[in-house]
Amino acid sequence: MKKIWIQIKNISMSPTASWDDIKTQVLTERELLSNYLVFIAAIPAISGLLGLIFMGENFFRAVFWAVLFFGFALLGVYLTAKVMNFLATSFNAEQNTQTYFKLTAFSATPIFLSGIFFLIPPIYGLSLLGLYGFYLFWIGFHRIVICPREEQFNFFFISLIAYFLIIILIFLLPALISGTAVYQGIL
């Protein structure tokens, strides 16, 4: 657990050095998922569960939302990596799902950490601090993705759009499917 907090601190406070370190790490998708991602993705799921219960939501509906959110969060990181890997050839970039999975997982850190604000629904707006994750995505992209310089911005921009849309779906779908959208201010 201490290693996770060190990684969170490093990626948040020293992103350039952290990305250089991440680039050299040999992490399988399974290792990254089980040793890092499940823990940070649990933060908004658990915070949202407690926040929904606090606001008077039905316990089982809140649990259903939390399970959906957690699953969609993990799936979203995985899908973003797969989309980037698929798009890579269009931009003459290296196809390497492992690199794209590291990029999306570690850049999602502030997005998932900002989920702590789900604990108190009236301050959901502070979860916008998670937008720092898109900055980390920018820094990480230029540090770990192998792509010709002339194609780099285009590949980054298309990848960012895909990442952004998938993040929006991660946040919307669980609320809509579980019926908690009213409590979360979506409907």
PLM regions: where:
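Alpha-helical transmembrane segments with an aromatic anchor "belt"
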Residues: 57-116
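Perimembrane helix-loop junctions in membrane proteins
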Residues: 21-24, 51-56, 89-93, 143, ...
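N-terminal juxtamembrane cytosolic/stromal segments of multi-pass membrane proteins
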Residues: 1-46
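Short charge-dense sequence patches
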Residues: 31-35, 51-58, 82-93, 164-168
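Membrane-cytosol interface at the C-terminal ends of transmembrane alpha helices
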Residues: 75-91, 128-145
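Membrane-helix interface segments in multi-pass membrane proteins
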Residues: 44-73, 118-130, 168-187
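Structural motif marking the loop-to-transmembrane transition
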Residues: 1-8, 30-35, 56-67, 71, ...
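Interfacial aromatic "cap" segments that immediately flank transmembrane helices
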Residues: 20, 26-38, 95-118, 135-167
